[in-house]
């Protein structure tokens, strides 16, 4: 069983870097870097953990649900993967094209961050929706490995063991996505001071990334959706980079897992330390206000006696 969990964990780590949906990672990173909020680093890292966890929930949850459905007999879902990938690409392409004109469509699936202060960081709901789209685009490339893991789990384990396999698969995806999220947040905090001039162009930069991402996904999935083979050759640029990333992750699975755990614990400790310092900072001015006032009172100059007061005796009569 331990070997099966390790296999599921490794498969989950490889899932986010598949060639079918790998182009969505730059869009997500661009959205995270687009947040120009000048918050302290612990706050930014905490937000990155939340967005990465939400993205993992949408991504791994969608793939796990699809795996359960297909393992139950609904194998027609895998045949719809090319259409899902094509639809995701067209949606991103249209959204980016509209944003290039200067407009911001009010859709439920917000894949961008506005440069306005009121927009704030991406919400967990938006990141989870992004993860669902990421999984839909990655369905065909990642489903073979997931089904192989599910088949072994069904043959060797109970239903509780099957749930443990899915949990290990989700943990593997979380290890990669959380590291990407935290690294992006840390880089964003450092880069914000250097590339502030690009902030006013953030929406158009994000739109350009969405257009390129959508165009790639549509180009990749159109032949498969219409009955042909995918046009992305194994030696293509993005496919080659994805294969290189996959090979590197396979060779460093344990190191990535340990690093992810250390990073999550470090960010959690930094967030707790930041929260414990905030009440002390807010209580300092109120606690020192009375002493400051007392210092002002004790050091206030004495009233200067007037001539009228010096010309009167103790009975109040004039001398």
UniProtKB/Swiss-Prot annotation:
Q: Name one GO molecular function term.
A: metal ion binding
Residues annotated as binding Hg(2+): 298-299, 318-319
Entry keyword set = Mercuric resistance, Mercury, Metal-binding
Q: Which GO terms describe its biological process?
A: response to mercury ion
Q: What is the name of this protein?
A: Mercury resistance probable Hg transport protein
Q: What is the species of this protein?
A: Streptomyces lividans
């Amino acid at each position: 069983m331990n070997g099966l969990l390790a296999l599921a964990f490794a498969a989950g780590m490889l899932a986010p870097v598949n060639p079918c949906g790998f182009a969505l990672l730059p869009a997500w990173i661009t959205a995270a870097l687009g947040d120009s909020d000048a918050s302290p680093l612990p706050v930014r890292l905490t937000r990155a953990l939340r967005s990465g966890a939400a993205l993992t929930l949408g991504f791994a949850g969608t793939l796990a649900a699809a795996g359960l459905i297909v393992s139950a007999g609904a194998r027609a879902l895998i045949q719809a993967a090319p259409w899902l990938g094509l639809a995701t690409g067209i949606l991103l392409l249209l959204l980016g094209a509209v944003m290039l004109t200067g407009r911001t469509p009010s859709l439920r699936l917000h894949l961008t961050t506005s440069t306005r202060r009121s927009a704030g960081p991406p919400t967990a709901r938006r990141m989870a929706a992004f993860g669902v789209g990421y999984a839909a685009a990655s369905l065909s490339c990642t489903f073979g490995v997931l089904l192989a893991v599910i088949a072994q789990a069904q043959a060797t384990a109970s239903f509780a063991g099957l749930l443990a396999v899915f949990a290990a698969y989700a943990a593997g995806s979380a290890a990669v996505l959380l590291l990407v999220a935290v690294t992006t947040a840390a880089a964003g905090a450092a880069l914000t001071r250097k590339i502030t001039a690009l902030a006013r162009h953030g929406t158009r930069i994000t739109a350009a990334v969405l257009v390129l991402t959508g165009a790639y996904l549509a180009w990749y999935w159109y032949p498969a959706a219409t009955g042909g083979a995918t046009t992305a050759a194994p030696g293509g640029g993005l496919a080659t980079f994805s294969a290189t990333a996959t090979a590197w992750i396979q060779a460093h699975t344990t190191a990535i897992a340990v690093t992810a755990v250390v990073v999550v614990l470090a960010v959690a400790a930094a967030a707790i330390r930041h929260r414990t310092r905030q009440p002390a900072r807010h209580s300092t001015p109120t606690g020192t206000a009375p002493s400051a006032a007392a210092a002002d009172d004790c050091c206030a100059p004495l009233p200067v006696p007037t001539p009228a007061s010096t010309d009167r005796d103790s009975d109040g009569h004039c001398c």
